[in-house]
């Protein structure tokens, strides 16, 4: 039984972002149900969108909604699903990349306010350290 779940373009992104000083183990894969989670980065900084962006177009052309589970990343292809886990409390959420950014130095991913608050402590303001994993659905290749 062969299962394929990695997109070649994501493979290139993962390896181009991993340096000899990076603590990320890019070969770390977890399987839960029909999904695999491939570690992309630990200790990444996440922030969230301000409400003023609601209703504006994202780089993918979609209209931004701060109540949906979406995110911005500088490199992931639009439509990529990632699991974002708050390293302080272990809470996680799955978001779909539909925009580019963040453009603040040191930030890796911008989450919608809904996604950010789902995994934040207390009222969920500011930024947090997160683990980012690529999400792929396992597709059975047997006919």
Question: Where do the protein language model's features map onto the residues?
Answer:
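Secreted/periplasmic proteins
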Residues: 1-143
């Amino acid at each position: 039984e062969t299962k394929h779940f990695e997109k070649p373009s994501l493979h290139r992104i993962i390896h181009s972002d991993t340096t000899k000083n990076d603590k990320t183990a890019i070969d770390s894969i977890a399987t839960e149900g029909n999904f695999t989670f491939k570690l992309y980065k630990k200790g990444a900084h996440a922030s969230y969108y301000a409400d003023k962006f609601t209703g504006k177009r994202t780089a993918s052309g979609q209209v931004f909604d701060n109540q949906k589970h979406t995110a911005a990343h500088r490199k992931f292809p639009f439509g990529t699903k990632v699991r974002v886990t708050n390293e302080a409390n272990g809470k996680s959420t799955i978001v779909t990349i539909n925009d580019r950014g963040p453009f603040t130095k040191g930030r890796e991913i911008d989450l919608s306010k809904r996604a950010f608050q789902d995994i934040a402590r207390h009222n969920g303001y500011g930024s947090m350290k997160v683990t980012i994993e690529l999400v792929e659905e396992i597709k059975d290749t047997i006919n």
